Amino acid sequence: MTTRKKKRAAPAGNDGFSLISNEKLIALYAAMLRCRMLDERIRALAGPGRSAFGRGHEAAVVAATIDLLPKDAISPPRGGLTPCLVKGVRLKTIFTWLRAQPDALPARYALRGIIAPGADIATQLKAALRAAQLARATKSKNLVVVFANCAQLTRGVGLEFLRIAAAERLPILFVCHARSSKEDFAPKARDYGLPGITVDGDDVVAVYRVVSEAITHARRGNWPTFIECKPWTVGDRKKRGAGSALNNMEAYLSRKGLFSTKLKTDLTARFTRELDKVSQL
C-alpha cells in the first residue's frame, strides 16, 4: 500500500493551473466565514460552553463537506452544527436542533444526510460504518464523512472501526483534528490498512485537494481514507491562531487578486441578516 505523506497547498495560478476554479476558491472562503459566524452567534446566545464545532476547524469542515452530493452523509460529533450548515441544512433547522434534546433528533437528521451524533465515539462510528456498508452493498457510490478527534479514532474502539472500514473497503472518509503539531496519528491508521494523509489544518486549499482525491477513490470503491488535519509548524514557528484558517485564505485569495474588503463586508452583512432572522432563542 502506498504511504501517504504530509501535504501543503501548492502554488496556484489562475483557474486552470490550480485545478480549483476562482469561483470554488471564493466559495470555500465564504463557507468558512459562515461557519465562523455561526459558531460565534451560538456562543453569544447559548454561552461559551455551547459551540457549533467549528472554531479553529473551519478549513477541514468546509473542505470535506462542500462538494458532497445530497445523498452523501456526514457524521458530525456531538454539537457539530457547522458541518450541517455546509451540507446544506437551513439555518432555521440548525437553530431548531440547537434548542432540542440531542436524543430527539435522529429522524430529522437522517432526512438531511446527517448521521445523528452519538453519546460517545463508539456509537458515532457504529452508525457511520452502518451507513457506509449500506452504500457499498447497494453500489450507490454514496459516501460518508466522519468528523472526530484524532486521539479518539486511533485508540481503543476507534482502531477496530478503522480496521473494519479498511477490510471492507468502505466508502468513508475519516477527517480528524490533532490538537498539536507534535501529534502524529496518520501512521496508526496506515498500520490498520488505511491510507493516512497529514495536512495543514489551517489551509483549506490543501485540505480540499486531499479530500477531493479521497472522495474520488471512495466513489470508485477503492478504499477509505484517514485525513489528519493538524497545526502546521514552519521551523520553530507555529502557524496556529484562532482565526488562522480564515486569515490564511484571505492572504491566499489576495495573492490571486480575488480578495477585497468589500467581498468580506458583503458576505458578512448578508449572513448576519440571515442569522438575525432565525437565531432568537
Question: Positions of the model-derived regions?
Answer:
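Conserved acidic/glycine
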Residues: M1-V61, I66-P70, V234-L281
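Cofactor-binding active-site loop characterized by glycine-rich and histidine/acidic residues
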Residues: M37-A167, A186, D191-G193
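Glycine-rich ThDP/TPP pyrophosphate-binding loop and its adjacent helix/strand module
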Residues: A116-Q280
